[in-house]
Amino acid sequence: NFLHKLRDICTERGILLIFDEMWTGFRLSVGGAQEYFGVKADLACYSKAVANGMPLSILTGRKDVMKLLEHDVFFYTTFGGEALSLAAALATIHVLREKNVPAFLASQGDKLLHGYNEICEDFSITFTRCTGLGCRSMVQFDATGLVTALEMKTYVQQELLRYGILWTGFHNMCYSHTDKDIKNTLA
């Protein structure tokens, strides 16, 4: 209930609640964290996911707050009005809704997250675990006494790279990740 309580505090004190939806927008749900958690922000910003990687960012918000951008706030864009990215956004949102991509990301990501943790459990590995949400999870390491957590992460990255898996510590699922990709990663 953290976000709900935060919303209440911001409303009570006249503070704008701003969501950075760069990672959550169009991944947790088409409506981002606001839809997923049922909490409406006063302002929210989104990035390239809305346009499937094309250069586009979006600032959304309450009408009264957005009206301030017309006169009282200096606001500048790099690609403002660039039509290709806008067309990509429309097409992307259509596909996200039609194919329920956020649910697919959650399902595939859960397979990876739970698969990783099952391997750790099967081999009694206690110094690492996968946490987070299906669409974006992360592997955490504890120091083992022999090496630091960062060194352990580096060793794992090095070994995964030998098998053609580029991993930065996060799993950012995308619509093209198949069951075969997940099995290959967990192998």
Where are the model-predicted features located?
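Conserved N-terminal phosphate-binding loop of PLP-dependent enzymes in the Aspartate aminotransferase
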Residues: 1-187
